[in-house]
Structure formats: C-alpha cells, structure tokens
C-alpha cells in the first residue's frame, strides 16, 4: 500500500514537472518573441524550437512525459477554443466579399498544390496534409488543429509546425525587402501579405512597412483565412477517413469530429456579438497563445533533431515551392480583384 502511494506521488510530481517545463518554455518564448527579428517568428514557433533544443541539451525525465503529452494534446484544444476570441466576424464581413473570395481561392489552391508536391517528393501522407494545411490556413495553429483529424504522431505534428514556421519567417523577410518594388498601395500590400503568409505574426511583421493601413487589412484577410479552419478540418477528417476506410473499414460514424473547432467558432461568435469587453477579449487571446505555446513546447520536447532531418527535408522543399506558388497567386489576385 505504501509503495503504491509512493508510485502515485511520483507520477503526480512527474506530471506537474512536465506541465511546469512547458509553461516555463512558453513564458520564455513569449518574452523572446518581443525582441527584434524574433518577433517575426512569434511565440508559438519559438516555443517549439526551444522544446527541441531542451530535449537535445537537457533531456526530458521519463515521469514528466505524461505532463508534456497533456500539454500537447489537452491544453492545445483548450487554447484553440480560446483563440476564437481573436476573430471578429463583423470586421471580416465589413471587408467585403472580395476578401472571402481571395481567402477561399488561396486556401483551395494551396491545399491541392502543396499536398500534390508532397506526393511528388514522396513525403509521408500525414505530414504532407499537415504541411499543406499549415501553408494554406494559419501556420502552426492549423497544423496542430488538423493533426487529430489524420491521427498524426507527435513528431509529424512538430515537424510540420516547424517547417511552416521556418518558411513563414523566410517569406516575411523577403516580402519586407520586396515591398518597395512590388508596386502595391499600402492597402494592396496588406491584402497580399494577409492572403499569402503563414502565421499571424508573419503577417503583422511583413505588413508593417506599409503602415497601419496595410497591417489592419492584412490581419483581417489573414483572420478570414483562419475562419476556414472549421470547414477544412471537417472536410479533411471526412476525406482522410474515407481514404483509409478500405484498410481500416471505418464507417462515416467513426470519423473524428473536431469538437474543439466548434468551440473556436463559438468563441469568435461571442466576440463578434460584443458580449465580452475588448480588454477582456485581449487577455483571453494572450491566454490562448500561452496554452498553445505550452502545447508547442510539449511537441518540441517529444522530437529529436534527427527526426526533423529525416522527416522534414522533403516536406520543406515541397512547402517552399508551394509557398512560392502561393505568393505568385496572391500577387495575381491582388491585381485581378482591384486591391491596389
């Protein structure tokens, strides 16, 4: 009996230790994300990279794994639900139908192109789907939201999120350098940035040279893409379930429904209706990013650099080519739809 109590106490301590490590990493990532250049990467990206470095340099105690796994799965879902508070559907509606059109075209095009490229490069199917969704919708948040739909492993999820983060940072720097020669008005440049970059942090950083006009519309366009996360997650779950059905004999009733995504949508509706004051909504968004950063840290703590090299090289190339295609499409759409 006494031995059982000791074991249980040890497990509880290990669980708390795992949660504590992810929280520490998330806090450090938040402050690092406020520094020059690192603010381009954002808190989520930095958290997953710190997690990978922590594992390589220090290691993770065996008893702490339960806590890091809890953060990477349970806290992740809660964080995504709260992240819905970032959306204001009224602002998106005011932006007009053209914004919805450009978001729908960009997402559809990118999903097919990037996933097609991952097949050409023989990337593992689940990682290919995650790379495509992260590029098309909202970066690392999309990767971790779609992962349960395709039953992705932690290392696949972490590698997918890291790939998207690195690509987004590269393209953010390129956009900033090219802004003077692209020929866009600040408004058009904001639409272009919001329609083609990966993370919200990337969008804000890239649009900054265009001033507040560019940043404001860039965020609205980006958040319009984020709203597509709900239908895309459901469609991916249905499609993946059917594609695997012949092997697993799964029925439509067995398909995973991402209930936390509906929570995300519900929170965005609450924000849009003005039920919660903007100040409170802002704090909720900060909490959401903190929880998702803890999840990213948990994922990073479960991945070794050799795993990233093994799984990520071909997926990175596919994502790179796909991102170039996305940028070209975005450039064409800005001109075609009159966002000058």
Curated annotation (Swiss-Prot):
Membrane topology category: Multi-pass membrane protein
Protein name: UPF0324 membrane protein BA_5405/GBAA_5405/BAS5024
Keyword vocabulary terms for this entry: Cell membrane, Membrane, Transmembrane, Transmembrane helix
UniProt entry tagged with the keyword Zinc-finger: no
Family listed: Belongs to the UPF0324 family.
Disulfide-bond pairs as recorded: none
Subcellular location(s) per record: Cell membrane
Entry's transmembrane regions: 13-35, 40-59, 99-118, 128-150, 157-179, 189-211, 218-240, 255-277, 279-301, 316-338
CC annotations in GO: plasma membrane
Keyword Phosphoprotein (UniProt): no
């Amino acid at each position: 009996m006494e031995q059982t109590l000791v074991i249980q106490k040890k497990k509880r301590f290990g669980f708390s230790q795992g949660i504590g490590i992810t929280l520490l990493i998330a806090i450090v990532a938040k402050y690092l994300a406020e520094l020059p250049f690192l603010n381009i990467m954002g808190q989520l990206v930095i958290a997953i990279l710190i997690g990978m470095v922590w594992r390589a340099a220090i290691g993770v105690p065996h008893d702490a794994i339960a806590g890091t796994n809890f953060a990477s799965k349970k806290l992740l879902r809660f964080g995504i639900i709260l992240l819905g508070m970032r959306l204001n559907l009224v602002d998106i509606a005011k932006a007009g139908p053209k914004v919805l059109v450009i978001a729908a075209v960009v997402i559809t095009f990118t999903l097919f192109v990037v996933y097609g490229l991952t097949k050409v490069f023989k990337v593992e199917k689940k990682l290919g789907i995650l790379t495509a969704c992260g590029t098309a919708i909202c970066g690392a948040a999309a990767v971790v939201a779609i992962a349960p739909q395709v039953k992705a492993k932690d290392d696949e999820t972490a590698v997918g999120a890291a790939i998207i983060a690195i690509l987004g940072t590269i393209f953010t720097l390129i956009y900033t350098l090219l802004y003077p020669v692209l020929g866009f008005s600040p408004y058009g440049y904001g639409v272009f940035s919001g329609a083609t970059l990966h993370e919200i942090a990337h969008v804000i950083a890239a649009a900054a040279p265009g001033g507040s006009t560019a940043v404001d519309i860039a965020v609205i366009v980006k958040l319009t893409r984020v709203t597509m996360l709900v239908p895309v997650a459901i469609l991916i779950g249905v499609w993946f379930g059917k594609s695997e059905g012949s092997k697993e004999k799964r029925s439509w009733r067995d398909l995973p429904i991402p209930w936390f995504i509906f929570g995300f949508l519900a929170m965005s509706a609450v924000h849009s209706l003005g039920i919660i004051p903007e100040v409170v909504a802002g704090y909720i968004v900060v909490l959401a990013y903190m929880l998702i950063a803890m999840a990213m840290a948990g994922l990073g703590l479960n991945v070794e650099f050799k795993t990233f090299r093994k799984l990520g090289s071909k997926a990175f190339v596919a994502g790179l080519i796909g991102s170039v295609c996305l940028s070209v499409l975005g450039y064409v759409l800005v001109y075609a739809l009159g966002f000058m």
